[in-house]
Amino acid sequence: DVDKDSWQISLDNVTEKISKEAVGIIGVHLYGFAFDVENISNFMKKNNMWMIEDSAQSHGAKINGRNTGTFGDIATYSFFPGKNLGAFGDAGAITTDDDDLATLCRKLADGGRLSKYEHEILGWNSRLDTIHAAVLDAKLTLLEEWNIERRKIAKIYDDTLSNIEQVTLPVKLKNTDPVYHIYPILVENRENFINYLKDEGVSTGIHYPIPLHLQKAFSYLGHKEGDFPNSEKICFNEVSLPIFPYMEEDDVYYVCEKIKQYFKKT
C-alpha cells in the first residue's frame, strides 16, 4: 500500500511488506511528487535488489537537490503529450548508468538488434522517430520554466485549500521539490463536487478511479477490496484540479473560490 499522507510508496511499506523471494521493486513518483527514493534505493542496494523508478510524471522533480530518475538501476519516462515534457504523440525514454542494461534496452527497442539485419534477441519497434525527438529537444529548453509556473499555481492551491477542512492535500516529503504534473485533492462525495465545478465552468479529472489490485488484469493475485485501504481511499476520493504552465492566476483563484463556495453550501 502507499503512505496515507504522501500517497507514495514509503520505506516502511517496503521493509514491512517485501518478501524473501523479492528481487526488486518499481517505485512511482506519482503526480509529479518524489517518493522517498533516496532511502528506499539505499535499502535495496544493501539487500542486493534492483529498483526501477517510474518517472513518467516527474520530469524535473528533485529530492535533496537531485533529480528523480537518478537513484534506481533504471528510470522510465513518458513523453505522452499531456506530460510535463510531451511529444506530439506516444513517446518515452529509459535512462540508466549501467552500460549492459543500456545495451539491452537499445536492443529491445530496435527489434533485438544493435546493427542492421543482425538480431541477437527478440525485441520490439520502440524507436523514437525524428519528429518527436525534435519536438522534445525544443520543449526541453522550456521544461524548467514550465515547472516553475506549475509550482506557482500549486502554491496558490496549497495556501487556499489547506484551510478547507473537507479537502485533503498530499503531504510533500521533506527536501523534495515536486513538479505538479497533477494537482490532486481528496474530497468526499466526489461526483457531486465534480458536477458542481463543471456547472461553474471548471474542468477536473480523476487519477485514478481503480487501484491496481482491483483491476481485472491483476485478479489472478487474489486481492480484494480492503486489502490496500490507503490506495483505495485515494482512488475513490481523488479529484485533479486544473494546472498547466500557462494557466492565468485569476483562473486559479476562480477555481479556489468555487471550491470554497461549494463547501459553504454543503
Labelled PLM ranges:
Residues 5-87, 93-95, 240:
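Active-site phosphate-binding strand-loop segment of PLP-dependent enzymes
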Residues 1, 11-12, 16, 24-28, ...:
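PLP-dependent aminotransferase class I/II
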